[in-house]
Every structure is written in C-alpha cells, then in structure tokens.
Amino acid sequence: TALFADIPDWCTVVITLPTGMEPDGRLSFIKQLKSAGKAVNFTAQTGTPLNNWIARRFEANGKRIDRDAVDRLVFLSGDLMNRLIPEIAKICGYVPGDRVTAQDVEKLAHHIPEADAFQMTEEIARRNYDGAAAKLAELFAEDAEPVEIMGVIGWQVRQLYAAKIAEKSGRGVPFLMEILGTSSEYRARKIAETAAKFSLPALTNGVRLCAECAMKPRENGAITDAEAIKEFLICFAMESRRA
C-alpha cells in the first residue's frame, strides 16, 4: 500500500499484462493494486472492425490491400494486432506495387501453427500427401513441443468434424461460426469447404486417431516422441483415402 501511496497525483502508472494472462486475484499485491487503481479490459478486435483497421494500416504505408487478402492475412497470422503489425510492415516492405493481393499474403505472411495444421488437412483432403508432410515439417520447424503440435492438429480435426456434422444436418455457415466460436465468415467457410472433401467416417476416425495419439506413452507429462505425430498423419491419410 505504501508503494501506491508514494505515487504523486500528477502521475499515472499503467501496468499491462500479456494477452490471455489473468492476474491471480487471491494475491495480496493484486488486491492492493485493484483497490488503488482501476482494471481495464481491452478486448481483441474481430470481424469488420479488425478488417478496417488492417486496411488503414496498409493505407498508412501507401498500400491498398484486397478484401480477400485481408481475410487471408487474419486466417494465416491470427487476429492479434500486436502480431499483425510486424506482418503488415513486412508485407508492405516486400510488395513492390501499391496493391497487396492474397497471393502476396500467402507468400510473405508468417503462418501461425493453427494455419499450418489447417493447410495440412487441406492437403490430405486433396490427397496431396507430400504437401501434408511438408506442412507437418513446418510445424516441427517452429520448435514447439510435440504435445502442442498434436493439440493444434487435434483441434483442427475436431473443427472439421463439427463442420461435417453441420453439413449433414443442413446447417449453414452462420451456424458453423456459432459452434466454432469465430466471428470470421471466411474461416468458417474455409473449414466447411475442406470438411466437404472428407467423408464423415474419415473425420470420425481422425478424431479417434487424435485421441489415441494423445494417449501415447508420456514422460514428465509431455509427448516426447514426434514419431507418434508422424504415425498419426500416415494413419489419418490412409483412413481418409479408404473412407
């Protein structure tokens, strides 16, 4: 309390926390901090407000970005502004003209693991197994732990399964957006398009294979053998081809 009492009236102290971090309200310091100040939540922008902000950032750099390129950028690099700012600067620096296309974004933007996992399933749906293996290699190149990689892949397969169930029940993209918890029509549509290329048995088997891979022998609470994930890719590809 004495620490906060020493702050003069003309001074404002701002303490920021990383996205997704929630302060532990049981700690005495956090209790004192909240009593002395005010907690303000900054929610992440999504949908149209985020897309408009991206377009303005490109305009500030003398570029005009196509609408489908905006959707592709958010899909590949995520919707966090602090992650998008350096990506926008990089793309503007490399694109020679004043127009930025979806092809430019595909070539230059950093792919978050979720995007690589989705593209891996896209390649399996196309029966381009070399392409799927290449995408898995990109996931491994990110230096993430195997358990994290399998978590991302499993999440993606479950989304495809949900999209397939929605398709079978005659529900459209708005319903899919709701059950996936996304405000991006582009993302929901891409997932629906890819799910349509799989059979329901293939995706059912995919969910089962993900669970089996997650239950592989563990050491110190983490999957230590990346071979288990490679085995999953082979089995999922075979099941998808057979189903």
In which residue ranges do the predicted regions lie?
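Conserved beta/loop motifs at nucleotide-recognition and modification sites
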Residues: 1-243
